[in-house]
Each structure stands twice: as structure tokens, then as C-alpha cells.
Amino acid sequence: MEIAQRYCVQVDYQLRGKNYYAIGFENRASGYELRNPFFKGSTPPKDITHFDNNHTRCNVFEGFIDFLSAEKLRFNDLCDVVVLNSVSNIGKALPVLTQYSLIACYLDNDDAGRMTLSKIQKEYGDKVVDFSRHYPDHKDLNENLMWMCPKKTNKYKLKF
């Protein structure tokens, strides 16, 4: 909960006369990724999120829920972070990754995740390490974390 409060905000919105709320995760262009138990979407503009703390290693995640899972596991200590917020944003992330000597990818174990990993590897070769191999039986890092501690982690019951 503390981790989500550090990086996320509650976004209230109205759609067709009804009031809704979602967890919002800001990108570098001031758009938001939005999540609630019934909705997954975003506000424009769509972009990556980059936490630049002048480290030589960068962790790369497809979405902010995996990023928050990595924060819980303390994987992001002493690293910079790029959250793609969609694999379609890989073109926006590649120039940012130039500055890093090690690029640790925590991408999804699906075709889109593998294709994204392949694009990063094509651009940066041996600087790229695939960490999705550490959770081969799970779709993503968050699903792996939920499997590791099912009573402590619930993807949809975050409250602010």
C-alpha cells in the first residue's frame, strides 16, 4: 500500500453521467495509466515513465503493476526504471536506454513481451538481460509475486 501511494494517485472521472475512480500512474508526458477492478485504460498523451536517478543499470517493465511488484521486492534499489506503459511505446523507450550499461528486462511471458525483448536486444545486444526467465510459469512479475505470497498481495484491492 505504501509503495502504491508513493507512485500513484487516485483519479476521479465521470463517464456518461456516472462517477468513477481509478488508480493513476503518471507518464513523462503527464498522461496517466488507469486501473480499477473493472477498467484498464489511459489518458492521453500515451508515453513511457522514466525514473532517472543517474544509475548505470535500468530495469524495464511493460506496465506499472509489474513496476510496483518490483518495488515491493526491492528490485529497483540502485537502478533507474523505464515503464513502457504499453509495448507499443518501445520506440519511445529505446533512445532513453542508450545511457545504460545494463538493461534488465522484466517483461511479460507472452508473444508481445518476447517481441519487445527482441527489439531491445537487437538495439543493445549484450547489455540486455532477460529476467522473465526467473518467472517462466507466470504471465508476468506481478502474477509471480501473487503466487509467492497470495495472502499479502491482491492486485485489485488497493485503496487510497
For each feature predicted by the language model, list its residue ranges.
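TOPRIM metal-binding catalytic domain and adjacent DNA-binding surface shared by DnaG-type primases
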Residues: 1-20, 156-160
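Phosphate-handling DNA/RNA-contact segment within nucleic-acid enzymes
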Residues: 9-96
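TOPRIM fold recognition
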Residues: 72-160
